[in-house]
């Protein structure tokens, strides 16, 4: 009879541990992008990023080969079945 309250308390403690660890895992991640906001103010950094963006836009996409269509499957010629 005294075992039921102990099981309930133990279950509640396990539930709290699982939910706390789930919250810790969900909140983990990369740091905020606001950390890097001070670096963006320099004109040299802005100019370099503009130059890199222009270079990426001018990149030739034909450098990676050509896209040839897959060969179509042709039906084999009809073969007569001998009687």
UniProtKB/Swiss-Prot annotation:
One Gene Ontology CC term in the entry: Casparian strip
Expression (tissue specificity): Expressed exclusively in the root stele.
One BP annotation, GO: pollen tube growth
Keyword Cell wall biogenesis/degradation: yes
Record keywords: Cell wall biogenesis/degradation, Developmental protein, Hormone, Hydroxylation, Signal, Sulfation
Keyword Coiled coil attributed: no
Signal peptide: 1-28
Induction: Induced by excess iron and further synergistically regulated by lowering the medium pH.
Coiled-coil stretches noted in the UniProt entry, renumbered to this chain: none
Region span, Disordered: 61-83
GO molecular-function terms, A-Z: hormone activity
Disruption phenotype: Abnormal endodermal barrier formation in cif2-1. The double mutant cif1-1 cif2-1 is defective in ion homeostasis in the xylem due to defect in endodermal barrier formation in the roots. Highly sensitive to excess iron. Retarded growth under low-potassium conditions. Repeatedly interrupted, discontinuous Casparian strip due to patch-like localization of the CASPs proteins. Reduced rosette leaf size.
Hydroxyproline: modified positions: 69, 71
Chain positions with Sulfotyrosine modification: 64
Purpose of the protein: Peptide hormone required for contiguous Casparian strip diffusion barrier formation in roots via the regulation of CASPs protein expression and distribution in a GSO1-GSO2 signaling pathway. The Casparian strip is required for ion homeostasis (e.g. iron and potassium ions).
PANTHER family: PROTEIN CASPARIAN STRIP INTEGRITY FACTOR 1-RELATED (PTHR35290), PROTEIN CASPARIAN STRIP INTEGRITY FACTOR 2 (PTHR35290:SF6)
The protein's assembly and partners: Interacts with the specific receptor kinases GSO1 and GSO2.
Protein name according to UniProt: Protein CASPARIAN STRIP INTEGRITY FACTOR 2
Organism: Arabidopsis thaliana (Mouse-ear cress)
Gene name tied to this protein: CIF2
């Amino acid at each position: 009879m005294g075992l039921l309250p102990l099981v309930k308390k133990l279950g509640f403690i396990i539930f709290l541990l699982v939910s706390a660890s789930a919250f810790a895992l969900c909140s983990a991640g990369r740091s905020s992008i606001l950390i890097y906001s001070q670096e963006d103010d320099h004109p040299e950094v802005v100019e370099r990023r503009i130059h890199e963006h222009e270079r990426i836009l001018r990149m030739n996409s034909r450098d990676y080969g050509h896209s040839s269509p897959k060969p179509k499957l042709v039906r084999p010629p009809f073969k007569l079945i001998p009687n």
